[in-house]
Amino acid sequence: MSRVKRGVTARARHKKVLKQAKGYYGARSRVYRVAKQAVIKAGQYAYRDRKVKKRTFRSLWIVRINAAARQHDISYSQLINGLNKAGVELDRKALAELAVYNKDAFAAVVEKAKAALA
């Protein structure tokens, strides 16, 4: 068995981590030890925030739908209840898109919900 020196693989590993840490402030982008910790932490934040992103967007859609619904004299919760009773299966993303970009279609959806509640 020949002796294996670690220089090449260690250098490659260090380069990989430092490349990932490019753009970080101070030692985080220059010192391998610190950069490695920063990259690991960044990965944790990225993983967590991919989950949080879904919650954030859902709440944004709800805010938009509520604002648009109140212009038609109905609250968000009443609108959703009316849509469920009417059997309209539009998700919140689609409703928010209608509320922002297609106000006439949203008005028609609101009228359907109001009719189901009455």
From Swiss-Prot:
TM region(s), chain numbering: none
Pfam families in UniProt: Ribosomal_L20
GO cellular component, one term: ribonucleoprotein complex
InterPro entries reported for this sequence: Ribosomal_bL20 (IPR005813), RIBOSOMAL_L20_CS (IPR049946), Ribosomal_protein_bL20_C (IPR035566)
Record Gene3D superfamilies: 6.10.160.10, Ribosomal protein L20
GO BP: ribosomal large subunit assembly; translation
UniProt xrefs under NCBIfam families: rplT_bact
Family statement: Belongs to the bacterial ribosomal protein bL20 family.
Role of this protein: Binds directly to 23S ribosomal RNA and is necessary for the in vitro assembly process of the 50S ribosomal subunit. It is not involved in the protein synthesizing functions of that subunit.
Official protein name in the record: Large ribosomal subunit protein bL20
Gene (name only): rplT
